[in-house]
Each structure stands twice: as structure tokens, then as C-alpha cells.
Design a protein with these regions (language model features):
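Active-site loop-to-helix "anion-binding N-cap" substructures in soluble metabolic enzymes
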Residues: 1-398
């Protein structure tokens, strides 16, 4: 998949309309985590350094097509100015005369941040009229928002119809490069680690990866549906009854490929909302007591997974191994994060597929010690499923 990149564009003296993903968490009107803003800096700095006139657009939160002051892009402006060490202009509109006038005032090497795209219902509806208004703000288009690439919205897909050339930014290029290896020509041995609560959210991922990988390690709540398919009793652990037959079919197809946990950390009570857990003990996979539920993989499972991953050349990880929101039940997930860092140091390509696993590896302090942490939760998942991402397909082919 060869797409036009930022380096293929001549941006000097031109207005560059760039879609970024500044959908960051806010706390008390301030940016609580600036990871996504930092991720876009290489492309922003490249365009400004080349004398481009940069117009940045993003969404933040879910304002449902109306102006919500608490979801303004203004807190991002403060962070962006600090990180760039220069003034960034702001428009409290993202389309129309006000926004167009602000874009026109830009000089070479200056940047403008537009107000939240989703203050307009037309953005998520991919309205052609709204896309045309956005297109008036630039002479060329760059998409560096991989996290929204799975959405066919006006700023990611519709707008490209009004530009001769639409290019990928550095972050988009990096995502496509690493995730492309995972779904394409991965160096072997190639392993996948899949976790999370439910098998239903990972059906397409498993189906797409099973023929390609050497092993799939299954952890998290979804493991219990597989164990149930093997005829084991799993106490009060989460089981998707309507997926037990499917899990059994996968086990038959995958035979030697699917690796399941052999022990768990189990509890008698769990309240995820209150972040509280009752009594905890270790139990073998086949000996989970009635009334108890698995909330993390156990130490023997960690060692089993470590052995399986030893010598791997490519590993993709999507989904935590347990209830990682609670410290006591996050140790299995943190252990996997540590193993990922270890095998990266021995030369493996390691990719963390966004969402909860990205949050987990950040929390474990291992984000800098793996090859790539995807910035796209749903986007990376759909890419690994083998689906076409509208925001990527819309970019100009080389």
C-alpha cells in the first residue's frame, strides 16, 4: 500500500490543511495526557520548517454536533504552543468566513488550530458541502490522524475529493508501516497476543491472524469462553455462551497454534466501576472454584507465555490479560509488557495495537521499549482484521 507522503508535497508558501488526532483526555479544563499531540509533532515541525502555512483540524470528545464549551480545542492549543515553542493561532470556527480569514492571514511557517470539527453534525455524516468548506482552508491535504482513519468522515474522507493530492503524515506512515508488517509479510516466528474481556470483539482479528501466525496467545476474559469450549468449569468467570461453539471451532482449526492460560488469579467479588476487588487467590485453569471468577492470568501462565514468545521475530499484542484498571489484577498485563520489552531488546519487531493495551503498556512504563505503540484503538483493530480504512484509502496512491 504505497500512498503519497508529506515528503512528496511542495508545501512552501502553501496552505496545508492537516487532519490530526488531538482527541485527548481533559481534566479540569487541561490536557491530562498529551501523547496524541506529541505524536503529531514530527509532521507539524516538518511542514512549518519547510515554510508551509499549516491549518490543523481535529475533533475532541463526542459533542454530538453542537458547540460544547468543555470540548473546545483550546486546551490543546496551550500544549501545542508549549511543545513547538512558538505561537499557534486559533479560530473558534472550523469552517466559514472566520476560519477562512484566519487561514488567509497565515504567513510562511505559521500554524492555525481550528475549533472542534464535531461541533458540526455534518462532520460525522461526511457531508459533501461541509467537506467542501473545509477544503477551502488549504491548497493541499495531509492526514496524520490514524486514530480516526477507520471513520469515513468529512475531514478524513470527504475532504480528499476536493484536492488533487492528499498525503500521509509521518505518524500515518509509521502506523501503516508497522501494522502493514503485522498483516502482511511479518518475519517469523510470528506471534499474536490477544486479550480483553470478550471474544465477540476479536472474532475478525482471530480469523484474519490465525492462518498467518505461528502462535496466538489468548488471555483476558475471552480465555474463559475457550476453556468452556474445552469442557472446563470456570466458576463465575465471564463466558459468552453464544460464542462457545465458535471458540471450539477455532480450537479445532488452530490445534497447535492457540495457547491458553494454565492458571489465573481469581476473586470472590469484583466491582470494576468502584475499582474494588475482594479476596484473591491463584487457581489452576481446571480448578476455578464455584462462585469465583478469573480476573488476571497467573504466574504459571506468564512463564508459559514467556516460553512461547522466546525467539519470536514479530509480535502483535491487542488487549489486556486481566482487569488492568485495578492494580492488584494488573500484574499479568504488566508481566506481558515486560516480556514484550525483553524480546524487543533481542531484535523482535513488537507492535502494540492501540486501545487498552496501549494504555496498559504506558502504565507499565514500557512504551519506549517496544517497536511501536499504535495511536489508533478501533483503527488498528480494523486494520489487523484486514479491513480497508476509509481515511487511508482516500489518500493519493503513489
Amino acid at each position: 500500500m504505497r500512498k503519497l507522503t508529506i515528503e512528496d508535497l511542495d508545501v512552501k508558501g502553501k496552505k496545508v490543511l492537516m487532519r490530526v488526532d488531538f482527541n485527548v483526555p481533559l481534566k479540569g479544563g487541561k490536557v491530562a495526557d498529551d501523547t496524541r499531540i506529541r505524536a503529531a509533532l514530527p509532521t507539524i515541525q516538518y511542514i512549518l520548517g519547510k515554510g508551509g502555512r499549516l491549518v490543523l483540524m481535529s475533533h475532541l470528545g463526542r459533542p454530538d454536533g453542537k458547540r460544547v464549551d468543555d470540548m473546545s480545542m483550546r486546551p490543546c492549543l496551550e500544549v501545542l504552543e508549549k511543545q513547538l515553542g512558538r505561537k499557534v493561532f486559533f479560530s473558534d470556527e472550523c469552517v466559514g468566513e472566520k476560519a477562512e480569514a484566519a487561514a488567509e492571514r497565515l504567513k510562511d511557517g505559521e500554524a492555525l488550530l481550528l475549533e472542534n470539527l464535531r461541533f458540526h453534525p455534518e462532520e460525522e455524516k461526511n457531508d459533501p458541502g461541509f467537506a467542501r468548506k473545509l477544503a477551502r482552508l488549504g491548497e493541499c491535504y495531509v492526514n496524520d490522524a490514524f486514530g480516526t482513519a477507520h471513520r469515513a468522515h468529512a475531514s478524513t474522507e470527504g475532504v480528499t475529493r476536493f484536492f488533487k493530492r492528499s498525503a500521509a503524515g509521518y505518524l500515518m506512515m509509521k502506523e501503516l508501516d508497522y501494522l502493514g508488517k503485522v498483516v502482511g509479510t511479518a518475519a517469523k516466528p510470528y506471534m499474536a497476543i490477544l486479550g480483553g474481556a470478550k471474544i465477540s470483539g476479536k472474532i475478525d482479528v482471530i480469523t484474519n491472524l490465525l492462518p498467518k501466525v505461528d502462535k496466538i496467545i489468548i488471555g483476558g476474559g475471552m480465555a474463559f469462553t475457550f476453556l468452556k469450549a474445552q469442557g472446563l468449569e470456570v466458576g463465575s468467570s465471564l463466558v459468552e455462551q453464544d460464542k462457545v461453539d465458535f471458540a471450539g471451532k477455532l480450537l479445532a482449526e488452530g490445534r497447535d497454534k492457540i495457547v491458553l492460560p494454565v492458571d489465573f488469579l481469581v476473586t470472590d467479588t469484583l466491582d470494576i466501576k468502584a475499582r474494588q476487588v475482594g479476596g484473591l487467590k491463584e487457581a489452576a485453569a481446571e480448578k476455578i472454584p464455584a462462585g469465583w471468577k478469573g480476573v488476571d492470568i497467573g504466574p504459571k501462565s506468564v512463564e508459559r507465555f514467556r516460553d512461547v514468545l522466546k525467539g519470536a521475530k514479530t509480535v502483535v499484542w491487542n488487549g489486556p490479560m486481566g482487569v488492568f484498571e485495578i492494580d492488584k489484577t494488573a500484574q499479568g498485563t504488566f508481566a506481558i509488557a515486560g516480556i514484550m520489552a525483553e524480546i524487543t531488546a533481542t531484535g523482535a519487531t513488537t507492535v502494540i495495537g492501540g486501545g487498552d493495551s496501549a494504555a496498559a503498556i504506558e502504565k507499565a512504563g514500557m512504551a519506549e521499549k517496544v517497536s511501536h505503540v499504535s495511536t489508533g484503538g478501533g483503527a488498528s483493530l480494523e486494520f489487523i482484521e484486514g479491513k480497508t480504512l476509509p481515511g487511508v484509502a482516500a489518500l493519493t496512491d503513489k
